[in-house]
Amino acid sequence: MGPDAKKQKLEGVDHLQNGFPVTRFLAWCEKVGLELNPKVYISTEGTVSQYGMLAREDIADGELLFTVPRSAILSQNTTRIQELLEKEQESLQSTSGWVPLLISLLYEATDSSSLWAPYFGLWPELDPPDMPMFWSEEEQTKLLQGTGVLEAIRNDLKNIEEEYNSIVLPFITRNPEKFCPMKHTLDLYKRLVAFVMAYSFQEPLEENDEEDEDEKDILPPMMVPVADLLNHVAHHNAHLEFTPECLRMVTTKSVHAGQELFNTYGEMANWQLLHMYGFAEPHPQNSNETADIQMVTMREAALQAAQTEDDRLEMQKRWDFLCHIEMVGEEGAFVFGLEEVMTEEELKVSLKVLCMSKEEFAEYKENDGWEEDEGDDEQTLMIQEISHLPTPWRKLLHLSAKLTLKNYSTELSMDEALVNNITAYAKLSSREQRSLQVKYGQKRILHQLLELTKS
């Protein structure tokens, strides 16, 4: 599901069609009514990574690539244990909302008589993508320090273990006729979490329902055969459409014979792609690249800049107030894209509050953060406009960016030299290459911030 680097080109691309797992899977597709356009085929040759879909001949914009009937989708509503899951639904509530699907996968993926057995056969032993959560702790720390991925995967692993021990294992124990703790283990559960993370789809809510729905009503994930074989790039050429009867993959631009068909997983930065899917787009292909400055790092910068103990106490008061009005949080981040600030309101309000005079803050606090409409609140803050922010704001942002860069184990110049040296880059392992792409993209944005905020 994700690019390491271009593999072999199109010589012998059809050889996989004769391999038993894919032949069996394609026969299954026909049996369940999953229709593929004859202009496309599934292969591991000529794709950016693992399985992928390529064009046999030219395909027009808007052309249907395949349809997946709802009955072929694997979800908590289509599994053979659907009634059991419904009966136990109260005990299967979790923060992730994934437990019913994961239990469905535990059951279906370990039973050779499952309707979806040919689908699971594409991944022997259910080997997950090479996601950082499966790297050694030493490799995680060495390659991912400062990127945000390290904290994300440690949080994932903690939550997975807690979820398995507190919800899934008791369920398994209560249902010995279908499950076995020796078979449906924590290790298998982790691999299936990675499987869902990398390959599942979430159906969007109807537009007219979005305002009424809260987070707990978000539709659960589901596994969509064939759709999950398409790789991702920011500049994709296909997208998935949802209808009451089926899901349809349709081209969004014309595709030439021999080219790969790409879906999109959304506007995702490289650190998110590496964390969730195990890959990163090579620079400069990912137009959705971002860099984060942790909100607590700005607090640290404000405290460092304070001249006296009274000033530090004042900064802490202001930070507490920003937390009170829910503008910042201990785990939040200010997000900077290639062209715009993604968290404009949070950034502007935080800089304003931390930099205003005592008198201004007293009045601002009295109004609980409300001000008269200044007329530009809805405008997007473009990256280049940061240089026009008030001087105190720029100084605080500059120090925040400097502190953020200190979290990385290497300098931008070292990363740049590696990325631009084809020979040296080729000698890196695939994990090193992907991690390098993440760090390089983030540091470029942070260094741009340093330039825009320098005095």
Swiss-Prot record:
Assigned keywords, A-Z: Methyltransferase, Nucleus, S-adenosyl-L-methionine, Transferase
Enzyme Commission (EC) number: 2.1.1.-
PROSITE patterns, A to Z: SET
Top-level lineage group: Eukaryota
CDD domains: SET_SETD6
Primary location recorded for the protein, binned into one broad class: nucleus
Leading EC class: transferase
Coiled-coil regions listed in the entry: none
Any GO MF annotation of the entry: protein-lysine N-methyltransferase activity
One GO BP: regulation of inflammatory response
Pfam families with a match to the protein in the record: Rubis-subs-bind, SET
Chain ranges of the SET domain: 38-266
Compartmental location: Nucleus
Family that this chain belongs to: Belongs to the class V-like SAM-binding methyltransferase superfamily. Histone-lysine methyltransferase family. SETD6 subfamily.
Function: Protein-lysine N-methyltransferase.
PANTHER family noted in UniProt: N-LYSINE METHYLTRANSFERASE SETD6 (PTHR13271:SF34), UNCHARACTERIZED PUTATIVE METHYLTRANSFERASE (PTHR13271)
Annotated protein name in UniProt: N-lysine methyltransferase setd6
Top-level taxonomy: Eukaryota, Metazoa, Chordata, Craniata, Vertebrata
Name of the gene this protein is made from: setd6
